[in-house]
Amino acid sequence: MGSRFGRRKERNGDMLPLYESQSPQHLDSLENENDERISKLTGKVKSLKELTMNIGTEITSSTKLMESMNDSFDSTKSLLSGTMTRLKNVSKNGGISIWMWLAFFCLVALILVLVRF
């Protein structure tokens, strides 16, 4: 009969560790079961490691893409800012309001889009 500390009494009253009281075949089957579980666990750990590495690679590439997009937006912002400043100067000096220029550019953009498609 097993005790709560993993020991078992022999007929002569000695206490033996529970693993010594098991048959060798049973111990071999337990060892094989442990080996199978270890190999499954190793496979899962490898899969998680690969997934983590892929996530890291994706994060790195996404960060680079966002940085390049940020640089592009900054250059576009400065270009548009300069264009708007020049447009304001032209509209003030030429007597044509900025709204007329805006309507003109929208019309040109619309024509370009319609011609393209």
Curated annotation (Swiss-Prot):
Comp. bias intervals (Basic residues): 1-10
Cytoplasmic side: 1-94
GO terms (BP aspect): endoplasmic reticulum to Golgi vesicle-mediated transport; intracellular protein transport
InterPro entries: BET1_SNARE (IPR039899), T_SNARE_dom (IPR000727)
Subcellular location: Golgi apparatus membrane; Endoplasmic reticulum membrane
Chief location of this protein within or outside the cell: Golgi
Origin: domain of life: Eukaryota
Listed GO MF terms: SNAP receptor activity
Membrane topology category: Single-pass type IV membrane protein
Any one of the GO CC terms: Golgi apparatus
Transmembrane annotation, as ranges: 95-115
Alphabetic keyword roster: Coiled coil, Endoplasmic reticulum, ER-Golgi transport, Golgi apparatus, Membrane, Protein transport, Transmembrane, Transmembrane helix, Transport
Subunit structure: Component of a SNARE complex consisting of sed5, bos1, bet1 and sec22 or ykt6.
Biological role stated in the UniProt entry: SNARE required for targeting and fusion of ER-derived transport vesicles with the Golgi complex.
PANTHER family in the record: GOLGI SNARE BET1-RELATED
Family in the record: Belongs to the BET1 family.
Protein name from the UniProt record: Protein transport protein bet1
Gene from which the chain derives: bet1
